[in-house]
């Protein structure tokens, strides 16, 4: 399949942005990470006065056949139940989105039990969940391509409506297993470095999960190319996020990268086009084992470390005020020359 072209960031604006940041009424570097964040926002949006518009989080939900192998502490029906919770406004991502003025969209990417039409629910379902990759590939290549295309389409719709800052969340029981296999196969790291307790497995459950994933990786040893790995181990929500990352970067949007699952989807996107990373703000490092190692693969320094392990886009929503603050100081803070404040002595 064809993917949108991602334009590398133009560094020509960097000196102007850095000079504007340094001229603010503060000691050089005194706003720390906010300064590098403001610089990145300006480079992504191509202006020394970046304005962040219509912040949005899209939550993609889908079920995983590998849940039937007992790799999660929760049954598969929780995915559909949590989607209903999203639609009722009762989940953590709903609370944080309301708190911070973020638009929230819920997408049925392929929940096992078909969901009734409801206000706020976007139907992009590919199938009634993926197949069990411990036995057979999770998706056909055609399904993976359709999911990526759907994710791209959702992003393009928001871009056309003026959104220029977007994050992606997910809901899918057993999706940490899918993410761990994607991570292991695409990075070559030991599975032990990629696998965690997910929604709260005990020691016996973690051992069972590791055994299932080890067998699955051996079964599908031929899956090596990024799209093959995605189709073999991924979920519909992960594939949609991978497509969404590519479309957002191609649309020159600021991308809020959430937790382990979202970062695994980004790994697929990055293997397809490395330029996608230039548009990404890594919002946090989750408590899920594997996320830190995956962030290290990207050389990423996340904004927050709150031991989150929820997904849903919650880390992206919590980090949004930092981006808003970075843009605000760049646009609104007085300069030494304008305020009549003396600069530091040579």
Curated annotation (Swiss-Prot):
Encoding gene, per UniProt annotation: cobT
Family recorded in the similarity comment: Belongs to the CobT family.
Protein's UniProt keywords contain Protein biosynthesis: no
Keyword entries, A-Z: Cobalamin biosynthesis, Glycosyltransferase, Transferase
Any one GO molecular-function label of the UniProt entry: nicotinate-nucleotide-dimethylbenzimidazole phosphoribosyltransferase activity
Stated role: Catalyzes the synthesis of alpha-ribazole-5'-phosphate from nicotinate mononucleotide (NAMN) and 5,6-dimethylbenzimidazole (DMB).
Active site positions: 312
Keyword Glycosyltransferase in record: yes
CDD domains hit by this protein: DMB-PRT_CobT
GO biological process: cobalamin biosynthetic process
Protein name, per record: Nicotinate-nucleotide--dimethylbenzimidazole phosphoribosyltransferase
Positions of disulphide bridges: none
EC number: 2.4.2.21
Catalytic activity: 5,6-dimethylbenzimidazole + nicotinate beta-D-ribonucleotide = alpha-ribazole 5'-phosphate + nicotinate + H(+)
Short name of any one Pfam family annotated for the protein: DBI_PRT
Domain of life: Bacteria
Organismal lineage: Bacteria, Pseudomonadati, Pseudomonadota, Betaproteobacteria, Burkholderiales
Pathway: Nucleoside biosynthesis; alpha-ribazole biosynthesis; alpha-ribazole from 5,6-dimethylbenzimidazole: step 1/2
């Amino acid at each position: 399949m064809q993917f949108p072209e991602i334009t590398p960031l133009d560094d020509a604006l960097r000196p102007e942005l850095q000079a504007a940041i340094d001229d603010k009424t503060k000691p050089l570097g005194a706003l720390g990470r906010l300064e590098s964040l403001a610089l990145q926002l300006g480079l992504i949006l191509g202006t020394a006065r970046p304005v962040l518009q219509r912040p949005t989080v899209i939550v993609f939900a889908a079920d995983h056949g590998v849940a039937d192998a007992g790799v999660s502490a929760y049954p598969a029906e929780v995915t559909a139940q949590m989607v209903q919770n999203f639609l009722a406004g009762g989940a953590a991502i709903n609370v944080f989105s309301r708190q911070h003025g973020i638009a929230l969209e819920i997408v049925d990417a392929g929940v096992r039990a078909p969901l009734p039409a409801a206000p706020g629910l976007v139907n992009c379902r590919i199938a009634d969940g993926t197949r069990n990759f411990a036995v057979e590939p999770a998706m056909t290549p055609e399904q993976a391509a359709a999911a990526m295309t759907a994710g791209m389409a959702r992003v393009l719709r928001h871009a056309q409506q003026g959104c220029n800052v977007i994050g992606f969340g997910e809901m899918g029981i057993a999706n940490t297993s899918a993410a761990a296999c994607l991570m292991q196969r695409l990075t070559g790291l030991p599975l032990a470095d990629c696998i965690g307790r997910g929604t709260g497995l005990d020691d016996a459950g973690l051992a069972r999960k590791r055994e299932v994933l080890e067998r699955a990786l051996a079964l599908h040893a031929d899956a090596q190319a990024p799209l093959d790995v995605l189709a073999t181990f991924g979920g519909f929500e992960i594939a949609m996020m991978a497509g969404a990352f590519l479309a957002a970067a191609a649309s020159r949007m600021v991308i809020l990268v959430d937790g382990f699952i979202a970062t695994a989807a980004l790994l697929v996107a990055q293997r397809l086009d490395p330029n996608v990373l230039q548009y990404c703000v890594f919002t946090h490092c989750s408590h899920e084992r594997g996320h830190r190692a995956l962030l290290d693969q990207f050389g990423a320094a996340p904004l927050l470390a709150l031991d989150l392990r929820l997904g849903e886009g919650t880390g992206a929503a919590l980090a949004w005020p930092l981006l808003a603050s970075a843009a605000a100081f760049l646009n609104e803070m007085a300069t030494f020359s304008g305020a009549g404040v003396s600069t530091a002595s040579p």
